[in-house]
Amino acid sequence: MLDDIILLYVVFEESFMKKQNNIICTVLLVALIIAIPLAVFLIRDIDNDTWFMLNHGRYIMKNGLYPQYEPFTVHEGMEFTFQKWLSCILFWLIYKYLGKVALKLFLYGVYMAFVFAMYKLLEYTKKDAKIQNLATLVVLNAAMTQYLYTRPQMFTYLFLAIELIVLEKYVRENRAHLLVIIPILSLVEIQLHSTIWPIILIYMLPYMFDVSFSDKIVKKLKILPVRKYKRLPIWLAFIASAAVAVINPYGFESVVYLVKSLQIPELKMLISEVRAPEPLSVNAFVIAVSLVIFVYGFAKKKKIELRYLFLFGGTTLMSMMSARQMSFMLIPAAMLMAYFFDFKKISNVMKASFALILALVSFDSVFEASWGQSHYQQYVTDACDALYEYEPNPEDTSVFNLDDEGSYLEFLGFRTYADTRAEVFSDKINNSKRSCPHHRTAPFFYSILNLIILLSLYAMIFDFINNKKAIFINTL
């Protein structure tokens, strides 16, 4: 009898301690998930892309959605459309009435909605694994830090997570009415962020081609289990999602905007995130680690859902071609971490090591955000603010600048030579033969402009003090 009581006590104590440890782990992981993105959003100041969106939102509220010509630069006759018009209006209203911090907190809230949606998605992939799924979200947060800016891509991430939840739920339950949500996401996405809208369709492709042509191969290899579900409803949802995208202020022009932009060869030269990741860059390291995890997980589990293979493989290829596409690879990569691994089978030493790595990587993300803010963005902002202090009538002043400072100068009211919207200055987009030559001959222009700045320093100072009509600025 006494032995039974002792045994019950030991079992109860072990169960209680295990429960206590789970609670502590849950609290710590949730704290990291909440705190790290918040710190990054608050530390990072509004960047050049957001400044031009605020400027655009202010313009739309005053003048409407259809300017006759591009209104912010010194160039004439360039056609122009507001490709993120709804985000521009939303951002401007929040900034105008609630301030900069409120805009950051709003987008932080959108990102946390994405994190919550990802948690629900991971629960579909790995049930009864709360600690593991929370740890996976911490890893995802650390990798996503470089994309946490006050930009409309926060909405895109949220919509993609919701889309995958809908598709996964449909695969398991075969309830076709769930797919109605995806065309709605497509319609809202093209209003908020039309320049990346096709990613909604791309995420559907693995579910559309899950089996069809590969049934025999699947059965022969016995490593790719196939779920039986109807593909036709997904095809119909795909067609509907593409069709509703035309419902926007600029019609078909917004639908094909990304395709037209990618045909501009100068973009890769001018925008680093459009180029393929450098071999020794952080992005290349993340891609390599993701591939190693995939190969190791597949070798250990010996099977994978075919749609996961297509989704991860396709987005990995995208991330290899363009650095900014890596964020779209991280979402399926998180799903694969939940699919392949089981933390319950990992030793306590490995768990402790993993927890330490999570903490270090998370706080390193905050440090990187702080370093980037203090060494670059603030310098550009301060330089533009200095001009604004000395120029009482910026709307009558033309500034011959380089790209990065252009958007903030335009927000302040100056007319600029160039800004960060590289594609706008190409005749493939603006339908003007008089488009800005800077974005076609950038290296030559950089050299000549810097030479002019150095040789005419005294003349510029004299002109700045007396005329205040034309200003050269170079923050490189």
Give short role names for the model-derived ranges.
Residues 37, 140-144, 165-166, 178-194, ...:
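Membrane-interface alpha helices of multi-pass inner-membrane proteins
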Residues 46-49, 61-66, 75-76, 194-299:
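Transmembrane catalytic cores of multi-pass membrane glycosyltransferases
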Residues 105-126:
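Transmembrane-helix motifs of polytopic, lipid-linked glycan transferases
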Residues 117, 140, 155-172, 204-212:
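Specific aromatic-rich, kink-prone transmembrane helix
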Residues 147-155:
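Short acidic/glycine- and proline-prone juxtamembrane loop motifs at membrane-interface regions
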Residues 161-179, 293-303:
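Membrane-interface transmembrane helices that cradle and orient dolichyl/undecaprenyl
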Residues 390-429, 459-460, 465:
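Short periplasmic/luminal acceptor-recognition loop of GT-C membrane glycosyltransferases, typified by
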Residues 416-460:
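Luminal/periplasmic acceptor-recognition loop/helix of membrane-associated glycosyltransferases
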